[in-house]
Amino acid sequence: MQDLIDSPTAARTPAEEKIRHEGNKLSKRLARETTRAIADYNMIEAGDRVMVCLSGGKDSYALLDILLSLRKRAPFSFDIVAVNLDQKQPGFPPEVLPNYLTSLGVPFHIETQDTYSIVTRVIPEGKTMCSLCSRLRRGILYRVAGELGATKIALGHHRDDILATFFLNLFYGGKAKAMPPKLVSDDGRHTVIRPLAYVPEHDLVAYAKFKQFPIIPCNLCGSQENLKRQEVSRMIQEWDRRHPGRSWNVFNALSRIVPSHLMDRDLFDFAGLKPTGRPDANGDTAFDPIDPEDPREDAGDACASSPADGDAAMAEQKVVFARL
């Protein structure tokens, strides 16, 4: 489809023109949502050197593509360097990413570390390798970031990844914890950002098809198909199919926490709670006949199609990149 982007209008059929039109709309939407996430969490600042971790999957390809586009419009300068970790998985095509990145003219670094052999030696056959593999990969990328002088490490996790992590922690870890758009690395030395935090996965699937990224399969290691994360992801997809808007409601709830109506004593001083004699907007609702399935019950903001829809005025003030 890249040919459709570059070809003159007169040479396109109506069907091709429609594909190009839809692709351009998608590109603008992804750029807009990425810009909002960057602005909301102050992910990128003037003079930053952003290390984009490129795996060869659709998400990291899209992240690099969008950041390169946004950099052209940004009111300040920042550098981008793409980094791939070749873990020596069987069947990994070592030429694909260097050829692609060279064609873009973007600086890149390929780090070769045989973590695959370590994982297969330590983890018994048939057991999940993802956790150990992830820890090894993370440590290597932190080291590379320091060697390259990167001030930000950009990962390609999207909205559905954040939701899946939340439910995994909820179902199997007993804690309300997700995947933050911005955090400090485990070693305390690096800032990790997720600019695609507001982007749903189905948009990235469509974008990869439109841009014809040279996708490298993600299951070269023989990862198991019944992983808990994949099960949770299927649950979220089924929700979207049967109950449109439900996953967005849950996602938006992650940024609308009311500590006084939860049970974490570290977040709210329940022990010291006393009547003040003044009305409280977040006060007692224990006896209110609220039906959470009733759209009339103050659900307007919660049903926004994206995190920015309910706060458009604030977003206009906070966006640091030029409007697209």
Curated annotation (Swiss-Prot):
Record localization: Cytoplasm
Gene Ontology MF term list: 4 iron, 4 sulfur cluster binding; ATP binding; magnesium ion binding; sulfurtransferase activity; tRNA binding
Subcellular location, principal: cytoplasm
Gene name for this UniProt entry: ttcA
Region annotated Disordered, chain positions: 1-26, 278-310
Sorted UniProt keywords: 4Fe-4S, ATP-binding, Cytoplasm, Iron, Iron-sulfur, Magnesium, Metal-binding, Nucleotide-binding, RNA-binding, Transferase, tRNA processing, tRNA-binding
Free-text comment on the cofactor: Binds 1 [4Fe-4S] cluster per subunit. The cluster is chelated by three Cys residues, the fourth Fe has a free coordination site that may bind a sulfur atom transferred from the persulfide of IscS.
Superkingdom as given in the UniProt entry: Bacteria
Protein name, entry field: tRNA-cytidine(32) 2-sulfurtransferase
